[in-house]
Amino acid sequence: KLISIYILKVWVYKMSVNKKFKILIYPGLHARPGSEFVKLCQSYQSSVTINVDDKTANGKSLLSLFKIEPKQFSEIEIVIEGDDEIELMNKLELWETEAYNNKEDFDNDQVSEETLKAFEVISDNE
């Protein structure tokens, strides 16, 4: 009985958290914001998976992230599993990075990047 209770606790504990977000920054999770996103995810023990349309990426790999091309206004699902999953998800909800608001600002040499909130929560499936 003790073994089955332990297995049940381990199984329940291995649940994940996931949320859907809209990317707010332009041009999306490209070079620097993408790199900062990956570094943030790597600073936690939990695994991170990002889903965009029918594509999936490892949130701790910049190359994997680039392959799914997460652009501004894309809807992404972030799935986190591990001991610190809730802490990391909370951090990502509030994450800010140096970026542009839109393409016009990006193309305008007179406009510099500013600190912006990267994501908007679309649905909360914790």
Model-derived segments and their meaning:
Residues 15-25:
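Short amphipathic
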Residues 110-126:
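Short, low-order "capping/linker" segments at domain edges
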Residues 1-14:
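Short, Lys/Arg-enriched N-terminal segments with co-localized hydrophobic residues
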Residues 18-20, 75-79:
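Beta-strand secondary-structure signal
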Residues 57-60, 108-114:
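Glycine/charge-rich, flexible interdomain linkers and switch-proximal surface loops
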Residues 27-47, 55-74, 86-90:
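Amphipathic alpha-helical interaction surfaces in cytosolic regulatory modules
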Residues 79-111:
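C-terminal structural segments of small proteins and small subunits
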